[in-house]
Every structure is written in C-alpha cells, then in structure tokens.
Amino acid sequence: TVLDKSGKYATVYMNHDRPAQVIYQAVACNHQHQVEWDEYAAFTNTIERKHFLEHSIAQPKLTRASLIKQFLKPPLYSQQYLRGFGTLYTAAYDVAKGRVQIIWPEKQVEASFTRFEEQEVQVVLLKPVGRYLAK
C-alpha cells in the first residue's frame, strides 16, 4: 500500500501466477481479494487484522500517534516467530516531511528520504524467561 503527499492511496496486489493489480483501498494484510488458503488465513489472522485496520482508520478522531500504537499490539503485532510468522517492525512514513520511523515496541529509529544514513539496530523479538521464551 502506498500513499502520496496529497493523501491518495493504492494497494498493489502481486502474485507469481497473475498480473499485478492496483486496488484503491487504504489497507492490506496477508491475503488479496479473497482468502485462498483458509489455514494460513486463520494462522495469520489476516481477516481479523484487515477488519481491525479498516475500523481503525474510519475513526474520525484517529491520530497518527494512536494508529502507530495500534501496530505495536495484537491483533496487528504478532510474535509467532517460533511458528514462522511475526512482526519484524512497523514502518511509519511521513511523506510530507520525507521521513520514516522504524518502530518496535521498545525502540524506534528515524531516517530521511533525502539524507539517508545507514544505521545498525539490534532488537530483541522474543525475550527469554528462564528456559522459555515470553510471549
């Protein structure tokens, strides 16, 4: 999903066995037009996450900061890493300022589109608790 400075958005669906398709919707998750693999959709909560996003952005008092916070907790934030699925980071683009924030629950970094400087960042995705990993 992309957004320009005027606020216009589009989502591009790409797949190996069909042509790319531009859809004018503001959100995207782990499925395209419809679910094609029920087990994967259930595992990733793709339908729930899409509905959550659509409901969130329809709220008239939604702020940028509150939307970003929603990406850092379920259902949008997932920690099923040991099962092969999870949120690695959230990217919050500010196209008017030409900046991006890369965000984790306990850390964030910023970068400029025009004066990009490479950064090295270490994050802990799952914290060990005794012999086990916390969820």
Give residue spans per PLM region.
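C-terminal, well-structured catalytic/ligand-binding subdomain of enzymes
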Residues: T1-K135
